Design a protein with these regions (language model features):
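Stable alpha-helical elements in mature extracytoplasmic
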Residues: 4-7, 11, 87-94, 168, ...
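Extracellular/periplasmic catalytic domains that process cell-envelope and extracellular macromolecules
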Residues: 62-63, 107-109, 220-224
Length: 268
């Protein structure tokens, strides 16, 4: 999923959505599998501007596996508490895996990045959720500005759904990678941009296998931000596009592999 913001509206002008934009049998990665880039392309957030529902609430701040998580009170009390407890347990599962995989110094930085989880946001339909890099995109649409600089899980129950786990078991890692890119490395980090440009010139992401066995354009080809987040999934865990895992990444895109090894640390 892409960070939602102005830069992605610009990116969509050049490339509308991801590989499935070219696939005659669309199966979006992160929009219910939906991608947040798709949410900007189709812009469900702005399609009904006059009908935006206010979804502001005071979250309950929880520490989950060392991360600060802003929790919708509906997930903790009342009729949705059981489902909420299961969703928060699954979020903890995602975060536990990240905590195991990252070296201590990188983990310390990663845990500074915050998460916001809604029972069900009425307008932002990207699932399980995007990363919001800035306030402007949010305030222009009447959304809570406190979502800025946070990974936003827009519908808690999406974390429990089988199709999401099959497609992208590292979705929280993907979104936290966006946050890390933005807040720790900087979206203008030159090494990532250079690696992305080299890969695009070589065309190595133009046609790859996805988790369904279909040949598609890799979501990493969208822009350098998705290139980094998608590569992070493969390097640290498993992605839903080839290269799926680290050994394949090392063979397919050694420049990105070595860069990620420097950023995240060696895996031995």
């Amino acid at each position: 999923m892409a960070p939602i913001g102005k830069s992605f509206a610009e990116a969509v002008a050049k490339f509308q959505k991801r590989p499935e934009a070219e696939d005659k049998n669309p199966d979006p990665k992160r929009n219910g599998g939906k991608s947040s880039l798709e949410s900007v392309a189709k812009d469900p957030a702005t399609a009904q501007e006059t009908g935006v529902k206010k979804a502001h609430f005071d979250p309950v701040i929880k520490d989950i596996e060392g991360w600060t998580v802003h929790v919708d009170p509906k997930l903790l009390q009342g009729e949705h508490a059981v489902e909420g407890g299961r969703a928060l347990k699954m979020l903890a599962n995602h975060l536990q895996r990240i905590a195991i995989l990252l070296p201590k110094d990188r983990l310390e930085k990663m845990r500074r990045l915050e998460i916001w989880i809604d029972y069900a946001h009425p307008n932002i339909k990207v699932e399980p959720g995007p990363y919001h890099p800035g306030v402007k995109w949010l305030t222009e649409r009447g959304y809570d500005p406190r979502l800025a600089k946070k990974v936003h899980i827009t519908r808690a129950a999406s974390l429990l759904e089988r199709h999401h786990m099959i497609k992208h078991p590292a979705v929280i890692l993907h979104e936290l990678a966006h946050a890390y890119h933005d807040q720790v490395l900087g979206f203008d980090e030159p090494r990532i941009k250079a690696a992305y440009e080299k890969a695009m010139k070589a065309g190595i992401y133009d046609e790859v296998l996805d988790y369904r066995g279909k040949k598609v354009r890799h979501y990493a080809a969208t822009n350098h931000m998705e290139y980094f987040a998608e590569g992070t999934e493969a390097y640290l865990y498993r992605n839903d596009f080839y290269p799926f895992v680290r050994a394949e990444l090392k063979n397919h895109d050694p420049v990105l592999h070595d860069l990620l090894e420097d950023i995240w640390g060696p895996l031995e």
